Amino acid sequence: KLDHGEYVSLGKVESLLKTCPIIDSICVYGDPSKAYVISLVVPDRNKLTELAEKLDLGTLTFEDQCRHRIITAEVLKEMTSYAKKVKLEKFEIPGAVTLCSELWTPESGLVTAAFKLKRKPIQEYYQKELKAMYGLK
């Protein structure tokens, strides 16, 4: 539930956005005191490199591509237009994204053996990034 009382089904948003070509894995997070959701995305390596090349940033490493603000902004733009295409409500569309260069594997403890998200461990692992997306320190 967001601060204006809208209930967001994180699983629904994730399953629809996971079909966006640039997304390999996604975890959507909603702070009940905020008006929008945010997202952590493990991008598809090839698609991100293609995007970086279009932006003349193809020489960057994958890790640097994931951290580059222009690339991140472009991914968010792609996600937003895709979200509208799959008919997500305005409040279900992530208002910010952090690109994660590390794959989420059962060994990392961030997903189960069946590759289902483990929300708590993901939120703890990316605590700093989640706060930054909401503009908190």
Regions found by a protein language model. Give the residues of each.
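AMP-binding/adenylate-forming catalytic core of the ANL superfamily
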Residues: 1-91, 103-107
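Acidic/polar alpha-helix N-cap and adjacent early helical turns
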Residues: 62-69, 126-137
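Short, conserved non-catalytic motifs in the polymerase core
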Residues: 110-111
